[in-house]
Regions:
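Rossmann-fold NAD(P)-dependent oxidoreductase module
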Residues: 17, 104, 108, 154, ...
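Phosphate-coordination loops involved in phosphoryl transfer and adenosine-cofactor binding
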Residues: 1, 65, 139-142
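N-terminal glycine-/charge-rich "phosphate-binding" loop or analogous flexible N-terminal tail
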Residues: 1-43
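Phosphate/diphosphate ligand-binding glycine-rich loop within oxidoreductases
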Residues: 6, 26, 45-121, 135
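Rossmann-like dinucleotide/phosphate-binding beta-alpha-beta segment
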Residues: 131-168
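A short, charged, Gly/Pro-tolerant segment at domain boundaries
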Residues: 122-130
């Protein structure tokens, strides 16, 4: 039977998916590098998010490890070169958060343009500052997007309906 360690906090759906396939799962979060080095030899798989950094030292101790899965877009917290050298497959979920992140960025842009946080704060204090909360329209504005990967491209698409000039 395979054994997987989930070393970062995430939905319990993750361990349920493994359990449904007959894979034993341990969820142990908040491990130091040394603690992970001490227990990693017993695992065939490792599931991380952002809190765990998978170093060369951890991989050197991971004698049974076959795969590392990163529940997220990047793998900058995993020593991919050392993993490859050890025959460990590294996988991630590129695009998994693209739409949610682009929509969140769009919501923040709209909130800033329309002064929504300030309007919310002052009206909750019982104040009505009509002139101070007057926002501006997004239409006919220029939006600079730094980084035009999946998220930047999706954000560009979202603002396209607002007649925005996008600079990349």
């Amino acid at each position: 039977m395979y054994k997987v360690l989930i070393s970062d906090a995430m939905s319990n759906v993750a361990d349920q998916i493994f359990n449904d396939k007959g894979i034993e799962v341990d969820v142990i979060t908040g491990l130091s590098e040394q603690e992970l080095i001490n227990i990693i030899p017993e695992y065939d798989g490792l599931l991380v998010r952002s809190a765990t950094t998978v170093t060369a030292d951890i991989l050197a101790a991971a004698t049974k490890l076959k795969a590392i899965a990163r529940a997220g877009a990047g793998v900058d917290n995993i020593d991919c070169a050392k993993a490859r050298e050890n025959g460990v497959v590294v996988m991630n979920t590129p695009g998994g958060n693209t739409n949610a992140t682009a929509e969140h960025a769009f919501a923040l842009i709209m909130a800033a343009l329309r002064k929504i946080p300030f309007a919310d704060e002052t009206t909750h204090k019982g104040e009505w500052q009509k002139k101070a909360i007057k926002g501006v329209e997004l239409s006919k504005k220029t939006l600079g997007i730094v980084g035009f990967g999946n998220i930047g491209a999706r954000l560009s698409h979202l603002v396209s309906g607002f007649d925005v000039n996008v600079l990349v």
